[in-house]
From Swiss-Prot:
The lineage of its organism: Bacteria, Pseudomonadati, Pseudomonadota, Gammaproteobacteria, Enterobacterales. This is Uncharacterized protein YhfX. It comes from Escherichia coli (strain K12). Pfam families: Ala_racemase_N, YhfX-like_C.
Amino acid sequence: MFVEALKRQNPALISAALSLWQQGKIAPDSWVIDVDQILENGKRLIETARLYGIELYLMTKQFGRNPWLAEKLLALGYSGIVAVDYKEARVMRRAGLPVAHQGHLVQIPCHQVADAVEQGTDVITVFTLDKAREVSAAAVKAGRIQSVLLKVYSDDDFLYPGQESGFALKVLPEIVAEIQNLPGLHLAGLTHFPCLLWDEAVGKVLPTPNLHTLIQARDQLAKSGIALEQLNAPSATSCTSLPLLAQYGVTHAEPGHALTGTIPANQQGDQPERIAMLWLSEISHHFRGDSYCYGGGYYRRGHAQHALVFTPENQKITETNLKTVDDSSIDYTLPLAGEFPVSSAVVLCFRTQIFVTRSDVVLVSGIHRGEPEIVGRYDSLGNSLGA
């Protein structure tokens, strides 16, 4: 999906990854991250958000819940980390990093609610009154006032499978009345997902029905005299979509893919954010006229299409296609069209969620000054593997 953008925006990353692989420093099934470029992308996002008065929570799941990288990005001015699930929150808190938003997309399990409250989480999203009551009880016990966001939805909204949740817009007034009667809670705002999506047909990011539902919910509460501090509208956050969010009065967004430049809008390599990572593998064997590289990093919604194959013997890079991958099977190996020498390097660049893969994450600094250096190795869940 992003091979052309990678070649256009960050050819130095390709060269550095292949060089480190030739030195035996990078193994197959590794996401190689250009630290300097991801920090530059992060800085551009912060600067753009400030222009439009939007606060940004840092999303880390796309780059493998990596605490080292998260700490560097937080230093740029992000308002804390959004933990999409409770295991991500655990990784970040163990690293001593501030989790600012928890509960969306995945609610906090009952026996972890108290810890989230006691740790000073800025906002906790709730989908049910039952969970709101758990947060209320934890807040009272801790002697705190806990801010919460309500996830809302309407019947015609778009929800990904496995993410069906929220309070129906038509019953929101009753829900809010219940929330306001719970001790220890402060209704800070509303959220939904996805609020923006890339439209391939028109070639740009557009608001979803979900965003309109979010706005309707805000306006409905405003008519009742309820002012909200936070209108949180995640999905497709980037330098070019932040102005659109500002038009709708959004106060908070949560960039993830924009940090690595792997947003659908950047398929041609023409966005302010530049590609900052690639996936490196190696030819394992041939079968019936095709080559198979080591797998582990495939993501079924990643739209991976093209690959670069590097043969050390002649220092040649050849472009080929990734053949159809059966999404119902484990990606032990991935099929590439044509036969290439065994143990040739393979480079792909596609949309990923590293935390659901088996990949290693290799952090590389100094690429653009011609001195690439590995500064960290992690697994896909943010655990250090040593330097």
